[in-house]
């Protein structure tokens, strides 16, 4: 049985989060958590929490063993954008877009 976990509105750019997500896609659950634990990227900490939550959901809801789980899908979608303005020269301003992400992780039995 598959179990999922979703983190909405994570304050990390989707482009940066997708780089980390690509590293753990298809790995076994315990090796993915181990890889994310030692990564220095901000997105790795957020994705690690979602993966651990999905593993806990699988153990609690379906009685799965962590050794039998792998990451079936991991999706990083765009979240809400915060628009800010920064003062520039000669009285002008530029718009700054602070992006956020929705991170979805689905774990299931290894095939």
Swiss-Prot record:
InterPro entries: Ribosomal_uL22, Ribosomal_uL22_bac/chlpt-type, Ribosomal_uL22_bac/org-type, Ribosomal_uL22_CS, Ribosomal_uL22_sf
GO molecular function: rRNA binding; structural constituent of ribosome
Keyword Transferase: no
GO biological process, one term: translation
Cellular compartments per GO CC: cytosolic large ribosomal subunit
Keyword RNA-binding in record: yes
Annotated keywords: Ribonucleoprotein, Ribosomal protein, RNA-binding, rRNA-binding
Domain of life: Bacteria
Covalent S-S links between cysteines: none
Any Pfam family matching the protein: Ribosomal_L22
Gene3D superfamilies: Ribosomal protein L22/L17
Family, similarity comment: Belongs to the universal ribosomal protein uL22 family.
HAMAP family xref list: Ribosomal_uL22_B
Functional summary from the UniProt entry: This protein binds specifically to 23S rRNA; its binding is stimulated by other ribosomal proteins, e.g. L4, L17, and L20. It is important during the early stages of 50S assembly. It makes multiple contacts with different domains of the 23S rRNA in the assembled 50S subunit and ribosome.
Subunit structure comment from the entry: Part of the 50S ribosomal subunit.
Protein name: Large ribosomal subunit protein uL22
Organism of origin: Xylella fastidiosa (strain Temecula1 / ATCC 700964)
């Amino acid at each position: 049985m598959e179990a999922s976990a979703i983190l909405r509105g994570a304050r990390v750019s989707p482009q940066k989060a997708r780089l980390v997500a690509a590293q753990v896609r298809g790995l076994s659950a315990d090796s993915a958590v181990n890889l994310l634990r030692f990564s220095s990227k901000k997105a790795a900490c957020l994705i690690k929490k979602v993966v651990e939550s999905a593993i806990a959901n699988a153990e609690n809801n379906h009685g799965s063993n962590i050794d039998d789980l792998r990451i079936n899908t991991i999706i990083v979608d765009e979240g809400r954008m915060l628009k800010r303005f920064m003062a520039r020269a000669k009285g002008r301003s530029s718009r700054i877009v602070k992006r956020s992400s929705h991170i979805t992780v689905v774990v299931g039995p290894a095939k």
